[in-house]
């Protein structure tokens, strides 16, 4: 069994036994046609591991805190689906250039208080970013949550994430590529 297969098996086991807030049951996985429609709407492919989570485990409803968002349809908790949220964030960034949303950065899980876990679909390792806009400063709103989606999932499985009570004071590393990826310039003072 490969490392990814072992990880997917562990995630599937926990997904069957732990419900995030707002989810009463684990949804069925998406089919290949749904994944293709999502990728067409986004304009880029999902990283293979993220695609496998949706294709093999469930259409959201598992993972830390509120769990993964569904790919195309709204979940029972009322959060928008991943594709819907990404497209809305990109549009909002065009309307408000002080808050640009990076291309290819897909929100996959809502933390509450407008915070999201996002996968950088352009990075080879599928870096997971934390979007935390409550500082009211775009340069202080993006952090590296985990260097890869694999690591982010392992941290959830191990119960060692920053969002756990025992780790809530953990420092986050700012995402250095934010300005490069948004091609935004600092507002004039």
What spans do the regions from the language model cover?
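Short, surface-exposed, polar/charged, turn-prone segments marking secondary-structure boundaries
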Residues: 68, 81, 134-138, 145-148, ...
